[in-house]
């Protein structure tokens, strides 16, 4: 499934569904990662060829994460805490932002079967992207409707994600 939405003159939302890993995760994951890798590489190469790479940020997300422990079908089930991949000409790459939790069973953020409680909301990353993209501050509540539920320290500073020079 593919879905494309223009959110503003500077923000485009693009959705593609590649499949699921409830069954046979190890057998399917390498192929799925190769598909994602090839797609991200093709996108980056096209943006560079069009000389727009420095004004583009791509963020790869999921509406849910996967459990770290296998289910009965050698797959992985839905969970909460997950990761994002960001890339673009202005992105400060090669870093992990945030604190990666302990994956061992019984760890503070592991509530069982490898289901991790997130330590950051998606707004903590989307708000600095909106700032970088030049979204007016009056629209922040529309883009990140839960942002007032968190202290300012919850949000990743745009300077941690982007080269702002």
Which residues are covered by each model-predicted region?
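Feature marks hydrolase-like catalytic cores characterized by long aromatic- and Gly/Pro-rich stretches
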Residues: 17-165
């Amino acid at each position: 499934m593919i879905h494309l939405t223009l959110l503003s003159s500077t923000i485009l939302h693009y959705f593609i569904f590649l499949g699921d890993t409830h069954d046979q995760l190890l057998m399917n994951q390498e192929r799925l990662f190769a598909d994602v890798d090839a797609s991200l590489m093709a996108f980056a190469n096209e943006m560079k060829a069009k000389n727009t790479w420095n004004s583009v940020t791509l963020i790869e997300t999921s509406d849910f994460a996967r459990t770290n422990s296998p289910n009965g079908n050698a797959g992985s089930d839905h969970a909460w805490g997950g990761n994002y991949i960001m890339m673009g000409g202005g992105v400060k790459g090669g870093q992990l932002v945030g604190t990666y939790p302990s994956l061992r069973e019984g760890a503070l953020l592991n509530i069982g079967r490898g289901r991790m409680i997130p330590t950051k909301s998606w707004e903590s990353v989307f708000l600095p992207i909106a700032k970088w993209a030049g979204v007016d501050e009056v629209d922040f509540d529309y883009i990140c409707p839960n942002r007032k539920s968190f202290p300012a320290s919850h949000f990743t500073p745009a300077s941690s994600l982007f080269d702002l020079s």
